[in-house]
């Protein structure tokens, strides 16, 4: 039966990832548990929520091989509260799992391994590797505009697709569109799948982990599943959304009548300040643009009003340039602008306008492989 010795800090991190996968209110006990398998000097931790399956291997001292399942939440809560030290985990059979630390001991109820589902197999139609850094970039640049409307299920995730050596992520909620891509080293079969929001968030946490961020991630695609292999010791398998993502190219403005170039941080900070006055029912800020100034203003029902002026400047730290003699006043949901401005770390941001009712194209000169479209609102 299972017996192993492991460092607390090693176990904490893996349990954190596992706990994040498991649904907090899972009514099926088997899916609320984590499977622990000790073999060949490794502890494999398996967790699932039926749509998503995560397997992690960590190096431990295996005294005796074995496997069991135990409450993910309880085990995670205990280990997180323990000081850094060695832990001994022992399967005591009918009396459960013993967790023994320096000055403490816990006994947890277990369930048989036979009740825990295995990871599904996948027959990949396409597979490739990219750096975790690149993968994190395209997910972070698009995840915030995923639709939360469950009736539009085909928009409830990021659209991962391959076209002509470009690996692209896109998402939209009908009010905004986010697109980010990287170039692959070799030609791969064109493919497109919709990765659910939960799965996108979980794999993003894994690839951004310090031990993974400088490594590659292998991605295997089929029509209904996607498999991620990161650092060889972490495997995530996810179901895909069965739907068709809209042809987003039709929503990208092809022309504009005016262009704003501004310091990203100054613009973002100003919008965030002015947005404080807005109310949830109708969130809108107005941008009043001219060659000389940008005025950002808002009126909040039963709160008051606010205004901030940014002057024309060629200085990099306060850059503002509007290229039209025609002044423009246009409104936006401030959250939509804030999300875009926070997603891409760049000194400057470019906004391309056609008229007050047309969608606005947003680009970053230092990040040409990120494109955003935001619909304006009436103010």
Curated annotation (Swiss-Prot):
Report the subcellular localization.
Cytoplasm
Its domain of life?
Answer: Bacteria
**Alphabetically, which GO biological process terms does the record hold?**
DNA strand elongation involved in DNA replication
Alphabetically ordered keywords of this record: Cytoplasm, DNA replication, DNA-binding, DNA-directed DNA polymerase, Nucleotidyltransferase, Transferase
Its Gene Ontology cellular component terms are: cytoplasm; DNA polymerase III complex
Q: Name one Pfam family in it.
A: DNA_pol3_beta_2
InterPro entries in the cross-refs: DNA_clamp_sf (IPR046938), DNA_polIII_beta (IPR001001), DNA_polIII_beta_C (IPR022635), DNA_polIII_beta_cen (IPR022637), DNA_polIII_beta_N (IPR022634)
Q: Which GO terms describe its molecular function?
A: 3'-5' exonuclease activity; DNA binding; DNA-directed DNA polymerase activity
Q: What does this protein do?
A: Confers DNA tethering and processivity to DNA polymerases and other proteins. Acts as a clamp, forming a ring around DNA (a reaction catalyzed by the clamp-loading complex) which diffuses in an ATP-independent manner freely and bidirectionally along dsDNA. Initially characterized for its ability to contact the catalytic subunit of DNA polymerase III (Pol III), a complex, multichain enzyme responsible for most of the replicative synthesis in bacteria; Pol III exhibits 3'-5' exonuclease proofreading activity.
Record family assignment: Belongs to the beta sliding clamp family.
- Record text on subunit structure and interactions: Forms a ring-shaped head-to-tail homodimer around DNA which binds and tethers DNA polymerases and other proteins to the DNA. The DNA replisome complex has a single clamp-loading complex (3 tau and 1 each of delta, delta', psi and chi subunits) which binds 3 Pol III cores (1 core on the leading strand and 2 on the lagging strand) each with a beta sliding clamp dimer. Additional proteins in the replisome are other copies of gamma, psi and chi, Ssb, DNA helicase and RNA primase.
- The protein depicted here goes by the name Beta sliding clamp
UniProt source species: Rickettsia felis (strain ATCC VR-1525 / URRWXCal2)
């Amino acid at each position: 039966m299972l017996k192993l010795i492991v460092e607390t800090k090693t176990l904490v991190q893996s349990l954190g990832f596992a706990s994040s996968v498991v649904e907090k209110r899972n009514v099926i006990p088997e899916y609320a548990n984590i499977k622990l398998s000790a073999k060949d000097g490794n502890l494999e931790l398996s967790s699932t929520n039926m749509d998503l399956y995560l397997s992690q291997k960590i190096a431990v001292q295996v005294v005796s091989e074995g496997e069991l399942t135990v409450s993910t939440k309880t085990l995670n809560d205990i280990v997180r509260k323990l000081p850094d030290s060695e832990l001994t985990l022992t399967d005591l059979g009918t009396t459960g799992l013993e967790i023994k630390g320096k000055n403490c001991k816990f006994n947890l109820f277990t369930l048989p391994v036979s009740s825990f589902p295995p990871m599904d197999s996948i027959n990949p139609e396409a597979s490739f590797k990219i750096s975790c850094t690149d993968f994190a970039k395209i997910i972070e640049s698009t995840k915030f505009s995923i639709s939360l409307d469950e009736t539009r299920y085909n928009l409830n995730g990021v659209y991962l697709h391959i076209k002509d050596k470009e690996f692209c992520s896109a998402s939209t909620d009908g009010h905004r569109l986010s697109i980010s891509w990287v170039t692959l080293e070799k030609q791969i079969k064109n493919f497109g799948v919709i990765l659910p929001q939960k799965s996108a968030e979980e794999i993003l946490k894994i690839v951004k982990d310090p031990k993974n961020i400088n490594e590659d991630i292998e991605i295997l695609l089929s029509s209904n599943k996607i498999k991620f292999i990161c650092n060889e010791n972490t495997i995530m398998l996810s179901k895909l959304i069965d739907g068709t993502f809209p042809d987003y190219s039709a929503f990208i403005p092809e022309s504009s009548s005016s262009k704003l170039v501004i310091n990203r941080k100054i613009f973002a900070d100003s919008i965030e300040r002015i947005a404080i006055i807005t109310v949830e029912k109708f969130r809108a800020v107005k941008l009043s643009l001219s060659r000389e100034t940008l005025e950002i203003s808002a009126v909040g029902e039963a709160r008051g009003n606010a205004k901030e002026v940014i002057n024309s400047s060629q200085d990099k730290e306060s850059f503002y340039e509007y290229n039209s003699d025609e002044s423009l006043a246009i409104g936006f949901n401030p959250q939509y602008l804030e999300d875009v401005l926070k997603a891409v770390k760049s000194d400057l941001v470019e906004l391309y306008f056609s008229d007050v009712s047309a969608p606005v194209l947003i680009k970053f000169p230092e990040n040409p492989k990120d494109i955003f479209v935001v619909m304006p609102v009436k103010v």
